[in-house]
UniProtKB/Swiss-Prot annotation:
Described function: Snake venom phospholipase A2 (PLA2) that inhibits collagen-induced platelet aggregation. PLA2 catalyzes the calcium-dependent hydrolysis of the 2-acyl groups in 3-sn-phosphoglycerides.
Any GO MF annotation of the entry: calcium ion binding
Cofactor entry: Ca(2+)
Name recorded for this polypeptide: Phospholipase A2 PS22
Residue positions assigned to the propeptide: 20-27
GO biological process: arachidonate secretion; lipid catabolic process; phospholipid metabolic process
Tissue distribution of the protein: Expressed by the venom gland.
Free-text cofactor note: Binds 1 Ca(2+) ion.
Protein biosynthesis recorded as keyword: no
Signal sequence coordinates: 1-19
Catalytic reactions of this protein: a 1,2-diacyl-sn-glycero-3-phosphocholine + H2O = a 1-acyl-sn-glycero-3-phosphocholine + a fatty acid + H(+)
List of catalytic residues: H75, D120
EC annotation from Swiss-Prot or TrEMBL: 3.1.1.4
């Protein structure tokens, strides 16, 4: 085997090892995004909520900076309660529909799906009812969220 072939083989192996450590994309975050769009009637893009305040986005700590951030903390706590029930809230898909008054869970028989859908619908409606303060997007969480 030529040295160049060994280098290519090594590069492929390293790439595969790196790909194996990439976590799967949570399934229900796409659904949650649709629920948010349904609740706010498309008035604000979903990505605006991904890095807002201390709790909107990955993780969370400290005191929520405003009502919208409080919605995110409540949603995080709801997901925590779902995990205590043995559910995997970020991975569950569920049935819902978008009505004139916002999103609703369909008649869901499985407890985990019903619970997580309720968490997401409550949060989406909370987001729609809370004012959005541009100054709280992409804040320095090490300074404001202790």
């Amino acid at each position: 085997m030529y040295p160049a072939h060994l280098l290519v083989l090594l590069a492929v192996c390293v790439s595969l090892l790196g790909a194996a450590s990439v976590p799967p994309q949570p399934l229900n975050l796409v659904q949650f995004g649709y629920l948010i769009q349904c609740a706010n009637h498309g008035s604000r893009a979903t990505w605006h909520y991904m890095d807002y305040g201390c709790y909107c986005g990955a993780g969370g700590s400290g005191t929520p900076v405003d009502d919208l951030d409080r919605c995110c903390k409540i949603h995080d706590d709801c997901y925590g309660d779902a995990e205590k029930k043995g559910c995997s809230p970020k991975m569950l898909a569920y049935d819902y529909y978008c009505g004139e008054n916002g999103p609703y869970c369909k008649n869901i028989k499985k407890e985990c799906q019903r619970f997580v859908c309720a968490c997401d619908v409550q949060a989406a409606k909370c987001f729609a009812g809370a004012p959005y303060n541009d100054a709280n997007w992409n804040i320095d969480t090490t300074k404001h969220c202790q």
